[in-house]
Amino acid sequence: MVKSELLTPRGLRTLAPKNIHYEGTYEGDQATRDHAYHQGTVWPWLIGPYIEANFRLYGKEFVKTAKELLAGFEEDMTVYGVCSVGEIYDGNPPYAPNGCISQAWSVGEILRSMAMIRKYEKAKK
């Protein structure tokens, strides 16, 4: 379910699109944005625990997929927040960045994920 309903190119959604409370975009006045904040927005920092869990399940076989997941952030790091990623993203494509322009824990999880990839690339089969 996580892969099919929550995973996006920018991290994991906080709520599946099939849920009746799902809000696919983070826009509008403050009250509307506050309501949408945990109702389907994508949180980039959740990519770290997702990658870690998959490495524990699949080991080295997950390296290619992990690299593909992180590649989704490369363009954003040169456009929205230079060398950083946004706090949250819309749950619907094209997954527009929102919230603060730079989120330390999201960057930290991307860096931690990169370190996990290097570790598993060096690991014996």
Language-model features: locations:
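Short linear motifs at secondary-structure transitions and domain/linker junctions
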Residues: 60-62, 87-88
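Extended glycan-interaction surfaces of carbohydrate-active proteins
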Residues: 1-43, 71-125
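Short glycine/serine- and small hydrophobic-enriched flexible loop segments
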Residues: 48-56, 112-116
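Alpha-helical support elements that line or immediately flank enzyme active sites
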Residues: 51-60, 66, 70
